[in-house]
Amino acid sequence: METIKTIARIRSDFPEKFGIPRQSGVVPETRAEIVFEKPYQNPDALRGVEGFSHLWLIWGFSACERDAWSPTVRPPRLGGNARMGVFATRSPFRPNPIGLSSVTLEEVRLHTPEGPVLVVGGADLMDGTPIYDIKPYLPYADCHPEATGGFAEEKRHYALTVDFPAALEAQIDPAHRAALRGVLAHDPRPSYQSDPERMYGVAFAGKNVKFTVEDGVLTVRKIEEIS
């Protein structure tokens, strides 16, 4: 039993890897839709799911597949310099490139032209990512207040102040502004890049958001349409 079937695809505002939150839940304002593949569009498969506030998503790192794997990786949390064992990290570069995300269940749409759709919050998945399974989050079993977090013990708060000129922010759909600010505040740059003169771009919700970072302040410089 080594065959894993894709039961659904995620529809998110992230068309590429750069800019996606590094963990699920750190930008709770993001919204995504889970659209089921035809063999799994029976609404009965979702009976009772509306009673849960959170879900576990099991999915594939479809944009990070490699022929070979390395026993050690460089976690962004450690600045991209120190190496840790792959099984002590959540790196996408694994023997089996499978991801696990905890998301909030925002809405259940059982009857749409595409079949059942789940709207979720806080997802850290690129648009089109294959979903292999969905399970309910069970607080009594899944929450461990006494847990320790190893090298990722410290909870990270927003690292950057976001300077978003009003004229540029007005080009963003109001429904996406809070999520975009959260994405930018979490510093989407690679940990090894800190050139204040460099212009970066995050593709989000149909826009390419260009920005620079200096002295802890991220300044949005330009908004471009993604064709």
Predicted regions span which residues?
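Conserved positions in beta-strands of structured domains
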Residues: R11, V103-E106
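Mixed-charge, low-complexity intrinsically disordered regions
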Residues: M1-I98, L110-S227
